[in-house]
Amino acid sequence: MGSVTSNQQPLIVAVCGDSGSGKTTLTDGMVRVFGQERVAHICLDDYHTFDRATRLRTGITALHPAANNIALMTEHLRCLARGESIIKPVYDHKTGTFANPEVLRPADIIIVHGLHPLYNEELRNLAHVHIYLDPEIALLQQWKIMRDSTVRGYTVEQVRQQMAIRRRDSRLFIQPQKQFADIIIRFSRGSLYYRTRDLAHLDVRLIEAKDAPKIDLSDVVEASKNGDRPALRLLEQEYAGEPRDVLEIDGTISHQKACELEDVIWAHMDTVSHLRPDCLSQLGLFYAGNILRQSDPLALTQLIVLYHVVNKMHEAASEETL
């Protein structure tokens, strides 16, 4: 049925993380910039094997691989990578049940996010960019309670109970996928958050894998300097026993400075400059409960991830012309 809109093989971006870690928020910004017509967007929750009532009755959590049709998600990702349409299942989080299947057509960019996109070697090999979201645990809990109690029909106490039940499966099946990520993104509460309790001003660390393709952000870091403490810092730190490049985004960054840095980052992506929205207006959007907010640290994080994706697109195009 459908086919990709160019002769180039689709680029697949896998975004992994625990429940409530911000996967949808991160990927929604990417879709808004690239455009719905260029992106096939898949939430792997659609591949749950059991509905909510069955999981509660049997005690199996959605984090357990046995509660997900990993074979089908792998086959569907293979089809999309070949430029073929799929008929995919649909899981409705509001009801905890399955809706009617839907057709998903391939596109230039395929964004797949969920609990298990890096779970096995075949899934990892299908994806070109691997991202793991790893917010500090207190934030993860806050985000999950806020989301599930406002839009997914749970009470706060039910969410707390579910988090306790899921802790073991997270440790066994979700967190080990972190080791396969090209970029680990960690949101944390910094000085401005503690003064204001404002989720729009979180600190962010982007930790690159040792063998991940490098992109040059030295001019972005230089442009971020404003007095003694730059808004962005590029460091080499030990992570999991290995030296890693770490980009830190300070939650205190001003909107004006964030827009200035946006200019510098977009200058690296001249081949897709036509996609550029107004100053961060399509990026950094997140829901605090039912209220739509905007965060400059989140916007810059999404833009840097976009830069990685565009860089990988250029690499793939160069390889195909050889």
Model-assigned labels for residue ranges:
Residues S3-P10:
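Phosphate-binding P-loop
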Residues I12-A14:
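Short hydrophobic/aromatic beta-strand immediately N-terminal to the Walker A/P-loop
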Residues Q36-C43, T49-F98, I109:
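Conserved nucleotide-sensing/catalytic segment adjacent to the nucleotide-binding pocket
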